[in-house]
């Protein structure tokens, strides 16, 4: 294994982990539990890759129909669907999932576990020169996109967990699964369009994703801060 390619694959992941960890400032999750979800994501990548390869054998489409099938079904549905299938029940059972921000933190760690193996596969399956280009492209575009999909999923899982209304809970559960699938599908669809203007569209799309999801993240960070200092004041009164 070439060290420089390995570092190219792993450094963006480590940056993502430190970044999202830094957002959990007041009631921090135990690192061992975050690593557990990271490893779950890495394990899921094997299952996801096998499922994607299987579905590609049923690809009988051409043109834009093929792009839709590959981006929304093979990539979006399988990757985000499998993550949600495992993440949601695992998170609901997680005893340290005590505030809304936690849903995002755990979701991103799981997604980064998946992205680690995916990065390795993409980078080490190419020739050296192409591997460097692939690694840089993924570090700048693909890894941040995975983080954004995970923030969306974690955001709605948290709304599902802490909502008292049953109808609302079902709605949030549905959104936790469907919205990341659609966001991922649109991302891959744009990525596969063979037009020069597609890269501009992709950059705009990623910027919009960042803006929307950073707002979601900030909302839960503010909620975490409010809860922390609220509990602190209650303890002082006692």
Swiss-Prot record:
GO BP term (any one): signal transduction
InterPro entries to which the protein is assigned, alphabetical: Peptidase_PrsW_arch/bac, PrsW
One Pfam family recorded for the sequence: PrsW-protease
Gene Ontology cellular-component annotations: plasma membrane
Residue ranges, Extracellular side: 52-71, 125-138, 194-196
Location relative to the cell: Cell membrane
Cytoplasmic topology ranges: 22-30, 93-103, 160-172, 218-238
UniProt-listed Enzyme Commission number(s): 3.4.-.-
Transmembrane parts of this sequence: 1-21, 31-51, 72-92, 104-124, 139-159, 173-193, 197-217
GO MF entries: peptidase activity
Group of enzyme by EC: hydrolase
Family: Belongs to the protease PrsW family.
Matches recorded under PANTHER family: PROTEASE PRSW (PTHR36844:SF1)
Function description: Involved in the degradation of specific anti-sigma factors, specifically RsiT. Involved in the regulation of extracytoplasmic function sigma factors expression. Seems to play a role in the resistance to antimicrobial peptides. Required for colonization or survival in the host cecum.
Protein name: Protease PrsW
Name of the coding gene: prsW
């Amino acid at each position: 294994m070439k060290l420089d390619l390995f570092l190219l694959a792993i450094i963006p992941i480590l940056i993502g982990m430190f970044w999202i960890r830094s957002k959990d400032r007041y009631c921090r999750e135990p690192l061992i539990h975050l690593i557990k979800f990271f490893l779950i994501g890495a394990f899921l990548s094997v299952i996801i890759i096998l499922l994607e390869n299987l579905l590609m054998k049923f690809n009988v489409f051409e043109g834009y129909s093929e792009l839709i099938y590959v981006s929304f079904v093979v990539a979006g549905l399988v990757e985000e669907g499998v993550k949600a299938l495992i993440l949601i029940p695992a998170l609901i059972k997680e005893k340290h999932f005590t505030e809304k921000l936690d849903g995002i933190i755990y979701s991103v760690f799981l997604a980064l576990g998946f992205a680690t193996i995916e990065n390795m596969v993409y980078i080490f399956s190419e020739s050296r020169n192409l591997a460097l280009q692939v690694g840089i492209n993924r570090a700048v575009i693909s890894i941040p996109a995975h983080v954004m999909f995970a923030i969306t999923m974690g955001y709605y899982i948290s709304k599902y967990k802490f909502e008292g209304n049953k109808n609302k809970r079902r709605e949030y559960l549905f959104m936790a699964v469907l919205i990341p699938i659609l966001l991922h599908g649109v991302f891959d669809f744009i990525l596969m369009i063979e037009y020069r203007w597609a890269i501009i569209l992709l950059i705009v799309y990623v910027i919009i994703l960042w803006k929307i999801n950073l707002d979601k993240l900030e909302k839960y960070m503010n909620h975490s801060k409010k809860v922390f200092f609220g509990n602190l004041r209650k303890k002082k009164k006692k």
